[in-house]
């Protein structure tokens, strides 16, 4: 089923996602989408307040909550998956954001946030995306030393690729970096780790939804 705004609206009503329904559901969905697309919380609030009074805090809540009714990746046979990770700053510390993209469908199968970048992180992340695979796909990686041992441990075939087929995961991170550039690629000092995880998970779910519409 194509995930239209009407379908998302029905899911929100069915799940009783929001305790209060004083604002129209369509405006809540649009608020989350506009924030994902790059507008700040305040700009989304100012724009949508022409239709209904919405605070920037409400926009933040909608962005984090709507992911709960967006489609998770389907479990199916997958041939090639490209994985990679980047550094993001939270306050004065760095974290790693990992992503896995199906090379053929360009769908993001999962994101993972860690404070370290090692074999254990690789195993935990790859295990989390294998639930969307009915087979053992081939994994495309860069030269990161934390990949080979972990992937062999999981019994997965892998190949080191710098460009070409791995461009899809680079494209995902390009979109993510453009979005985080709005706050200088740095989450605020008071951002909790769980909040950052939720923010990036929401980003992934909106990313897949928007891609499914094109």
From Swiss-Prot:
SUPFAM superfamilies: Ribonuclease H-like. It comes from the Archaea. InterPro entries: DDE_dom, RNaseH-like_sf, Transpos_IS6. Transmembrane segments: none annotated. NCBIfam families: transpos_IS6. PANTHER family: ISH14-TYPE TRANSPOSASE HSIRS44, PTHR39967. This is Uncharacterized protein MJ0017. It comes from Methanocaldococcus jannaschii (strain ATCC 43067 / DSM 2661 / JAL-1 / JCM 10045 / NBRC 100440).
């Amino acid at each position: 089923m194509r995930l239209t705004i009407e379908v998302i609206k029905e899911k929100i009503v069915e799940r009783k996602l929001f305790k209060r329904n004083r604002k129209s559901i369509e405006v809540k969905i649009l608020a989350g989408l506009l924030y994902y697309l790059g507008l700040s919380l305040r700009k989304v609030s100012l724009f949508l307040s022409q239709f209904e009074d919405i605070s920037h805090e409400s926009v933040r809540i909608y962005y984090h909550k709507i992911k709960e009714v967006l489609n998770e990746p389907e479990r199916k046979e997958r041939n090639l998956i490209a994985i990679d990770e980047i550094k993001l700053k939270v306050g004065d510390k760095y974290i790693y954001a990992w992503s896995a993209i199906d090379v053929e469908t360009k769908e993001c199968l999962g994101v993972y946030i860690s404070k370290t970048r090692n074999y254990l992180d690789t195993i935990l992340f790859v295990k989390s995306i294998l639930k969307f695979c009915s087979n053992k796909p081939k994994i495309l990686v860069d030269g990161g030393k934390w990949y080979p041992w972990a992937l062999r441990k999981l019994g997965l075939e892998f190949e080191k690729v710098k460009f070409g087929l791995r461009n899809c995961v680079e494209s995902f991170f390009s979109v993510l970096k453009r979005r985080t550039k709005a706050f200088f690629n740095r989450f605020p000092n008071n951002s909790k780790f769980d909040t950052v995880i939720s923010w990036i998970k929401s980003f992934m779910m909106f990313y897949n939804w928007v891609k499914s519409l094109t």
